[in-house]
């Protein structure tokens, strides 16, 4: 039985006091024994952390004790080993960096599709299926027939849209990412530009892999994750170190 719980979460909400939240959260992580990384910015909070069930429940309760975080949703996966080596709380300009001002996913994100709805929706040949992740993530695994924007980092995504999609504002566009946060921004950005039919996979690829049987899955390959597991398969089991040794090296240089 895998006794380490790995949780990812995010919330877009104005945090005027985000800088003052860093030390209390970090202190609590050390006190409980939680390892992972949490990012705070004016636009909200984003993070991934891990521990045993007792530790995680205590930390969930701590975070939710702030009324602004009372409805935080934690997406859980499981492993035999903690994929984080220490506790970190970082202050940033954005909780996921796209570099575009005045994009507010808290009120203008794309339409959510459950894994089951997504599974049916992306089989429509008239739907543009767009992977919002980086090129090395796409190369490791993606959905069947997904478009690769061929970007090295998320900051390049707006330029991709301007160069390749700006004349397709009337088309149905379905976007996906690992856990959902990047799609919150990409869909909000595209709606600001006037795209009319923008959809996103709720809770991302990890939710789809958990929900759709492997025998029916439209996912092909592995799913990159931002911790020491490097990637997971369709059963959400870690596949590193089955990956080539130089893959992790190349990833760390990006």
Swiss-Prot record:
The keyword Oxidoreductase applies. Keywords: Oxidoreductase, tRNA processing. One of its GO terms (biological process) is tRNA modification. Its EC number is 1.14.-.-. This is tRNA uridine(34) hydroxylase. Residues 123-217 form the Rhodanese domain. Catalyzes oxygen-dependent 5-hydroxyuridine (ho5U) modification at position 34 in tRNAs. PANTHER family: RHODANESE-LIKE DOMAIN-CONTAINING PROTEIN 7-RELATED, THIOSULFATE SULFURTRANSFERASE/RHODANESE-LIKE DOMAIN-CONTAINING PROTEIN 2. Coiled coil: none annotated. It catalyses: uridine(34) in tRNA + AH2 + O2 = 5-hydroxyuridine(34) in tRNA + A + H2O. It comes from Legionella pneumophila subsp. pneumophila (strain Philadelphia 1 / ATCC 33152 / DSM 7513). The keyword Oxidoreductase applies. GO terms for molecular function: oxidoreductase activity, acting on paired donors, with incorporation or reduction of molecular oxygen. PROSITE patterns: RHODANESE_3 (PS50206). The active site is at residue 177. It comes from the Bacteria. Pfam families: Rhodanese (PF00581), UPF0176_N (PF17773). CDD domains: RHOD_YceA. Belongs to the TrhO family. HAMAP family: TrhO.
